[in-house]
Amino acid sequence: MDFISKTIGLRLGYNKTHKLIWSLSKNNPIFIQTNHFLEYIIKNDPFFCGLILIDFQLMQYIVVHKNQLGNFSPLKNNLPNSINLFLKLKIATEIQSNFNSVFILEERLHFLFFKYLNKMKNLKMLNNLKIKVKIKFLNNPILEPQWIFYKLHQDLYKGINIRRALAKISSNVIKKGAEGVKIQIKGRINGVDKATVIVEEKGKMPLQNLSSEINYYSRALKTVYGLLGVKIWVFKGFLLK
């Protein structure tokens, strides 16, 4: 019998998003590809080495001058040849960030994103394309499941035993303020010919409670013996008390 994980969805009086927020008009469906592009940049570009993308928002905004407020109409100003985009990212890193490093990353991402959009066929004829980029670094990234996956990947790459790595990561997450953590790994672990399952769970994990704030992340981990399926749950507490 299957069980319901209730990872990310509607909560009582609380809506949670998964990775991205779209606030674009229906006339611009070409921006759907941008989430894959941003993940590729942060993973492969040397400027973003050691950074992990936690969440990002892509919104469209309209610039209106004071003299045009009387004649302003969203339907008339939202034309395909004048697109203004606002890109907001949440990034986790081990290195302490300062104003200069954030500014350099924002300028680099602005350049790459603008260059990428100009190459798209439907956007070649654009006369006015403006992009704003804002990057926010998380203060406590260890509570994010994406960061836990990154640390697990590092430990396995160094040759640390998988059970020891899971125990160390889960204990660190509990020490940083999480009320519960659960990590599940499936596949050919340690090169065994038979697929096995390892589950490391510490603290509470009320998956059936709608008022619980649980972050979830799943991804495939590539090893020499094949792919390992990794699922991570992090319980931060109850939203309604």
Swiss-Prot record:
Gene3D superfamilies: Ribosomal protein S3, C-terminal domain (3.30.1140.32). Keywords: Plastid, Ribonucleoprotein, Ribosomal protein, RNA-binding, rRNA-binding. One of its GO terms (biological process) is translation. It comes from the Eukaryota. InterPro entries: Ribosomal_S3_C_sf, Ribosomal_uS3_bac-typ, Ribosomal_uS3_C. The keyword Plastid applies. GO terms for cellular component: cytosolic small ribosomal subunit; plastid. Pfam families: Ribosomal_S3_C. It is found in: Plastid. GO terms for molecular function: rRNA binding; structural constituent of ribosome. Belongs to the universal ribosomal protein uS3 family. Part of the 30S ribosomal subunit. HAMAP family: Ribosomal_uS3_B. PANTHER family: 30S/40S RIBOSOMAL PROTEIN S3, SMALL RIBOSOMAL SUBUNIT PROTEIN US3C. This is Small ribosomal subunit protein uS3c. It comes from Helicosporidium sp. subsp. Simulium jonesii. The gene is rps3.
